[in-house]
Amino acid sequence: MSRPDSAVSLLPDYSLRAHNTFGFDARARVAARIGSPGQFASLARDPRVAGLDRLVLGGGSNVVFTRDFDGLVLLDEIRSRALVREDDGAWYVEAGGGENWHAFVEWTLAEGMPGLENLALIPGTVGAAPIQNIGAYGLEMKEHFASLRAVDLATGELVEFDAARCAFGYRDSFFKRDGRGRFAIVAVTFRLPKAWTPRIGYADVARELAARGIDARAARARDVFDAVVAIRRAKLPDPLALGNAGSFFKNPVIDAQAFAALRAREPDIVSYPQPDGRVKLAAGWLIDRCGWKGRALGAAAVHERQALVLVNLGGASGADVLALAHAIRRDVLGRFGVELEMEPVCL
């Protein structure tokens, strides 16, 4: 007889090395592979794991383990993708929380539904995308977000979230604040407008298109996708070859007065004006100016081509990476008066 959909096998003393892109060999007291929302719900009532802290892991691309996790790690393996409806203005596509983000983006293009191409090759899963409100090359996920479904880990209840309830911000959402650790995102629906125009405001994208002989004004979604993939592969290390979590720091946003004072001291500072009058600074530029690009502290290092990326050279611990991050933050604050915020969750 087959096991019921909600039945879950528990994996004691489980290695998380293959479940975090830094490759840290942290261990979970117990883990469970989750293939359906019902399995998340059943564990909320399971006496075998009563009272244990819970951590949902997708691709592990936004986490730094500084120690073993003395609780239950839920490995989200809910994989699905489908066009769930369409109207005259848009397609609505849904993907499971454990679906690989890049593969999902590529699928939408293959199905003739553009819009997410600027977010190509961002590591992680679909379920992690709203938590971080991922963004790159002039596009944030929230711009195409429609809704999501999540399981309340305490009660097992399935809850629907719209954009307002998610409270998206810059690399931020409800799930990083009041909702942190409380929900498992099992499905996300995106609205992809049929009236598509390329997002090519970033100079890197325009340059890559030009290098390929493509007029930016005539670029197709696949052209933008290919350009973004090429840029990211040139700048960012492959986690399978060199452990990392992508961009480790957020680009800081400061008010106009603080920026004017900073630019008076640093005329060539890289910056991006924001609609609200504030100014976003390039964290990588700040780190590079402090002399950190390519430097190492033990087996943890700043990547030689992209100062935003911290890497595990082999044998580094989460504590080593965190020590490097703190040293960088201290130097940037001391030189520029700007505080860098780390993107990954440190446990």
Curated annotation (Swiss-Prot):
Its EC number is 1.3.1.98. It is found in: Cytoplasm. The keyword Flavoprotein applies. GO terms for molecular function: FAD binding; UDP-N-acetylmuramate dehydrogenase activity. GO terms for biological process: cell division; cell wall organization; peptidoglycan biosynthetic process; regulation of cell shape. Residues 24-195 form the FAD-binding PCMH-type domain. Its main location: cytoplasm. One of its GO terms (cellular component) is cytosol. It catalyses: UDP-N-acetyl-alpha-D-muramate + NADP(+) = UDP-N-acetyl-3-O-(1-carboxyvinyl)-alpha-D-glucosamine + NADPH + H(+). Its cofactor is FAD. It holds the Pfam family MurB_C. Keywords: Cell cycle, Cell division, Cell shape, Cell wall biogenesis/degradation, Cytoplasm, FAD, Flavoprotein, NADP, Oxidoreductase, Peptidoglycan synthesis. The active site is at R171, S247, E343. Gene3D superfamilies: 3.30.465.10, UDP-N-acetylenolpyruvoylglucosamine reductase, C-terminal domain (3.90.78.10), Uridine Diphospho-n-acetylenolpyruvylglucosamine Reductase, domain 2 (3.30.43.10). Pathway: Cell wall biogenesis; peptidoglycan biosynthesis. Cell wall formation. NCBIfam families: murB, PRK00046.1. Belongs to the MurB family. This is UDP-N-acetylenolpyruvoylglucosamine reductase. The gene is murB.
